[in-house]
Regions:
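Short, flexible segments with low predicted structural confidence
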Residues: 1-2, 32-33, 58-59
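Generic detector of bulky aromatic hydrophobic side chains
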Residues: 9-15, 29-30, 69-70, 75
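Active-site-adjacent loop/helix segments that line or gate small-molecule/cofactor pockets in enzymes
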Residues: 1-26, 80, 86
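Active-site and channel-lining beta-strand-loop segments
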Residues: 20-40
Length: 95
């Protein structure tokens, strides 16, 4: 089965897909399996706003993956507390 056939067979059809299989990304560009380059206007629903494979994001992900990939919310997670503090103090207006 090719990628499109597998997606049709095994993945929930929540929305229509463009008939292109992205195999690599760099910055705002994506490449398909034939080597054709596309400008990515979707940016992973804003999850890739810095572009695909941004060096700083890649380095941070590699560092975190080497430390701890996932931890249950049953435990205290220092990074979660730090991020929550940062978001609240920067984004929430206090009376």
């Amino acid at each position: 089965m090719n990628t499109e056939e597998k997606l049709n067979q095994y993945v929930l059809h929540s929305y229509g897909r463009y008939p292109m299989a992205a195999v690599r990304g760099e910055g705002s560009r994506l490449w398909d399996s034939t080597g054709k380059c596309y400008l990515d206007f979707c940016a992973g629903i804003a999850t890739c706003v810095l572009g695909h494979c941004h060096p700083a994001v890649t380095q941070a992900l590699q560092k975190q993956a080497a430390t701890l990939v996932h931890c249950s919310n049953l435990y205290q997670i220092p990074q979660q507390a730090d991020l929550a503090e940062f978001i609240v103090t920067k984004c929430v207006e206090r009376p």
